[in-house]
A protein has these predicted regions:
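Non-catalytic accessory regions
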Residues: 1-105, 113-114
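AlphaC helix of the eukaryotic protein kinase fold
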Residues: 103-125
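Activation segment of protein kinases
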Residues: 110, 205-245, 276
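Activation-segment/catalytic-loop signature of the eukaryotic protein kinase fold
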Residues: 137
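Conserved short submotifs of the Hanks-type protein kinase catalytic core
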Residues: 141-155, 159
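Activation segment signature within eukaryotic-like protein kinase domains
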Residues: 174-175
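Protein kinase catalytic-loop region centered on the HRD/HxD motif
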Residues: 180-190
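C-terminal lobe helix-coil module of Hanks-type protein kinase domains
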Residues: 201, 211, 237-342
């Protein structure tokens, strides 16, 4: 469908994405009748009338998928095998949530719908700081969906792409959060069954939260034929491990094995398991027997850290950690030892320092306690700026889309960062428009912002 500025404005009003007064403000800003569609679109985005996600759908002629019940979709934040996840806002209260919607190809299968809703109900029981909460389950006849806690941050997979590896203390802190969430669930008789980097969310404050508890159970792994057609790679991994080691489905020790594989991955920067798209090859138990010892990849890792990884990833489940609480306890003990050793080495590095009056070196970094959001499209520059800021104590959130970065700032919630850096050399007018738009939004007007431009 071909839109004019006038017809696009009317479609926005008709669908309830904005009211006429908001559209009138756009017309007033433009101050002329004969404007082209591109200019009108830019003004809509700059004034926050619609998001990029909404605009893209509008321009393709879509009329559905903008609302789920009282929640208006702002943009898509994730897509998996069985569902898509959107950031959304309640039309009346302004509450920001995540809405998980069962994908269309699964909605016609009553068993899949029933399983999706059942797993949602299971998630309602889980209330823990290290688990993403489910607030509501909506059994809509056309589009069933879950209303969930929205976590301001990134997945562990996204962060690892930037950081490449984690130091032992940081990695163990992540795994302590993971095991704490698993422990809470296991006490209620619930296992995760889909532990992987993308199902660990890291909030802007650094807290890790598990998402998608039990949703992998939607994958049919009951027969070799079903496994061959199973779309969930991790569900196949769980089935292969359990069949190869003779344990029942839903054994919590399977979760602990894959928790150990996450710890291995973030320490080494590479997966312990041979990656393959061949589903039958994933069923071969030799993948689990041929894991390279972590110490051969990272020779200088403390033995206590290697021991945690090795025990979690024991192929024999009787030699593995038996409960999340057991694994959590050993991680916490190892953390205390590493932090004590680090503190001792810091004190002995400068014999003239007075321990009672001189705080640790990191207390002098000007960035301690502050977060910076960087918007940059080039991966190498993301890494460079991030490491420079990190060396000064700042926590850094990285985005490549200026519009999406601004959407992370909500007037109803604490700001995810204390400063915004927009890099214009690659992003061009997208970065400039976002920078200018900050002056028009009351909740962003006083946020410190830096626009980086090239020397030209």
């Amino acid at each position: 469908m071909e839109f004019t500025p006038q017809s696009l404005a009317q479609r926005i009003i008709d669908l309830g994405l904005a009211d006429s007064s908001q559209i009138d403000q756009v017309w007033a800003e433009l101050r002329r009748a004969n404007i082209d569609l591109e200019t009108f679109k830019s003004s809509l985005l700059r004034k926050g009338v619609v998001t990029n996600f909404q605009l893209d759908r509008l321009l393709t002629g879509e009329r559905l998928g903008f609302f789920y019940g009282p929640y208006k979709v702002l943009y898509m934040i994730g897509a998996g095998t069985f569902a898509r996840v959107y950031r959304a806002v309640h039309r009346e209260t302004g509450r920001v949530v995540a809405v998980k919607v069962l994908r269309r190809r699964h909605r016609d299968d009553p068993r899949q719908v029933e399983q999706f809703l059942r797993e949602g109900k299971m998630g309602l029981q889980l209330r823990h700081p290290n688990i993403v909460s489910i607030y509501d389950i909506v059994n809509d006849s056309r589009t069933p969906y879950l209303v969930m806690e929205f976590v301001e941050g990134e997945t562990l997979r996204e962060i690892l792409k930037i950081r490449k590896q984690f130091d032992p203390i940081s990695a163990l802190k992540i795994m302590a959060d993971v095991c704490s969430g698993l422990d809470h669930a296991s006490r209620l008789g619930i296992t995760h069954r889909d532990l992987k980097l993308s199902n660990v969310l890291v909030s802007a404050s650094g807290r890790c939260k598990l998402v998608d508890f039990g949703l992998a159970a939607m994958a049919d792994t009951s027969t070799p034929e079903a496994l061959a057609d199973c779309p969930s790679a991790r569900a196949i991994d769980y089935a292969a491990l359990e069949r190869g080691t003779g344990v029942r489905k839903d054994d919590v020790r399977s979760d602990l094995y894959f928790a150990g594989s996450i710890l291995y991955h973030i320490l080494a920067g590479t997966s312990p398991l041979t990656e393959t798209r061949d589903r039958l090859a994933r069923l071969n138990v030799s993948r689990f027997r041929e894991v390279k010892p972590l110490g051969t990849i990272i020779p200088n890792l403390p033995q206590s850290v290697l021991s945690v990884v090795s025990k979690a990833m024991e192929i024999d489940p009787t030699r593995r950690y038996q409960t999340p609480a057991e694994m959590l306890g050993e991680i916490q003990m190892t953390l205390r030892k590493l932090e004590a050793a680090e503190s001792t080495s810091t004190k002995t590095a400068d014999p003239a320092a007075t321990p009672e009056t001189t705080p640790p070196e990191e207390d002098f970094l000007e960035g301690n306690g502050f977060s910076v959001m960087l918007v940059e499209s080039k991966m190498d520059l993301q890494d460079l700026v991030r490491e420079k800021l990190k060396s000064r104590g700042y926590r850094v959130l990285v985005f490549s889309d200026p519009a999406r970065a601004l959407e992370r700032f909500s007037p109803e919630e604490p700001a995810p960062a204390h400063c915004l850096i927009l890099s214009a050399p690659e992003l061009g007018n997208l970065a400039l428009d976002a920078f200018n738009r900050m002056l028009e939004l009351p909740h962003l007007r006083d946020l410190p912002a830096i626009l980086l431009v090239d020397r030209k």
